Amino acid sequence: ILHSPIYKYMFMKNNIALHWFKKDLRLADNPSLNYLSKNYEKIIGVYIYDDINPIPKIGSASRVWLNEALKYLDKQLNGNLIVLRGNPKEQLSKIIEWFDINEISWNRCYEPWMIKRDKDLKSFFNSNLKVSSFNGSLLWEPWEILKNDGTPYKVFTPFYKRGCLEAKEPRQPEYLEINFFNHNFKNTDVSDLNLLTKKKWEKKIIRNWNVGENYSTEIMNNFYKDGLNDYADGRNFPIKKNVSRLSPYIHWGQVSPNTLWYELKKNQNYKNNNL
């Protein structure tokens, strides 16, 4: 709810697009955000906690991470991240109507239920505005790396040899300044999503992990500096620096795979160890 009809009228004079955050909780090398920033004056950032569609439940530890990641992202947006809960079709429709959105865009997710949901949403919204989607979480699209018979790989090593070693290099990461709309839209507070259960071990995660995009860059750089030497053996011991500790950042999209790829290629330890 906004405070006055006049405020809504002010939005209509602006060239505004909507980015739907999903598993891409970052600003750097975010293909959807980069696309919108090239075509629109202002961007509205929205995260919707979908508890309506029949989906696998998010694990308890992952919920803790999501809670902290959303708070961090909201700070990056200077408090302008719109957090909502419920059916994405209904929630997005409200935002699109209120802000008079010209285009909605997101980065694709590849779980089967998400593919179906997002296809339905794209068909639903396409009649009234432009809808775009991008690959923001994979080095290659699933249909780009296939066996000779046209079916997907099920074993990692053949996929690695044909994908990582033989396929064309993935796109270069792109880092643009993103201008988010400064608004007074009243939305759900992250704490109201009830992602935390007040169990003691949740505080340990928060205390021992720095959850946020900039921290992922720091961890990546430390791993490339100290973790590549003796990686072949050291990766089997979680206590050693040879374990990257990047998994949760990758899962929630706080670092792009393209950034990881090209930063690794520039690293001298990578070259010295023939990884």
Feature annotation, model-predicted:
Residues 7, 21, 189-192:
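Terminal low-complexity, poorly structured segments
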Residues 1-11:
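Short, Lys/Arg-enriched N-terminal segments with co-localized hydrophobic residues
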Residues 152-275:
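Glycine/tryptophan-enriched, flexible segments
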Residues 10-168:
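Trp/Phe/Arg-rich N-terminal binding region typifying the photolyase-homology
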Residues 1-3, 23, 101, 253:
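Generic secretory/membrane-interface signal
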